[in-house]
């Protein structure tokens, strides 16, 4: 029987409810509950999450800044070392060129000395041969003289 008085009360009531757009005390209460819930969720969940995300973003930015600074420094060092390497190669090539020129000069001096020594030996040998030739001619002339004297004496004695 409790249902009957309730239904009767409903029928006698002249007030029509607005349904979804009923502007009574529940709407501001629901709005207040939503704002309070949003504020509580903001402090409990969203603030720590945003703090973590901000810290992560700052860490990533710092890491990127450090990495780009390191990359710039590495590029500078690479350029410096490549320049030093190029200079060292050029110096090494210059040293090799100078050493080759010096070696060529030493070789040419040695060749000239060897040629001079060879010419000296040839000259001395020629001189020795000339002396021996003259000695041989003198000896031969003396032998010819003695033989001719001998022949002459044999011819005259006979």
Curated annotation (Swiss-Prot):
One GO MF term: proton-transporting ATP synthase activity, rotational mechanism
Keyword Transmembrane annotated: yes
Predominant subcellular localization, coarse grouping: plastid
Keywords assigned: ATP synthesis, CF(0), Chloroplast, Hydrogen ion transport, Ion transport, Membrane, Plastid, Thylakoid, Transmembrane, Transmembrane helix, Transport
Miscellaneous comment as given in the Swiss-Prot or TrEMBL entry: In plastids the F-type ATPase is also known as CF(1)CF(0).
Protein function: F(1)F(0) ATP synthase produces ATP from ADP in the presence of a proton or sodium gradient. F-type ATPases consist of two structural domains, F(1) containing the extramembraneous catalytic core and F(0) containing the membrane proton channel, linked together by a central stalk and a peripheral stalk. During catalysis, ATP synthesis in the catalytic domain of F(1) is coupled via a rotary mechanism of the central stalk subunits to proton translocation.
Protein name: ATP synthase subunit b', chloroplastic
């Amino acid at each position: 029987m409790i249902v009957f008085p309730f239904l009767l009360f409903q029928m006698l009531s002249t007030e029509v409810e607005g349904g979804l757009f009923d502007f009574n005390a529940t709407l501001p209460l629901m709005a207040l509950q939503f704002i309070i819930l949003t504020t509580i969720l903001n402090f409990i969940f969203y603030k720590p999450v945003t703090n973590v995300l901000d810290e992560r973003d700052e860490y990533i930015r710092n890491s990127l800044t450090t990495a780009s600074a390191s990359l710039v420094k590495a590029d500078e060092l690479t350029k410096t070392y490549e320049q030093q390497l190029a200079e060292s190669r050029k110096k090494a090539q210059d040293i090799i060129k100078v050493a080759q020129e010096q070696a060529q000069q030493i070789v040419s001096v040695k060749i000239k000395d060897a040629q001079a020594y060879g010419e000296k030996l040839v000259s001395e040998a020629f001189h020795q041969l000339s002396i021996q030739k003259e000695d041989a001619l003198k000896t031969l002339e003396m032998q010819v003289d003695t033989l001719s004297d001998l022949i002459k004496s044999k011819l005259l004695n006979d």
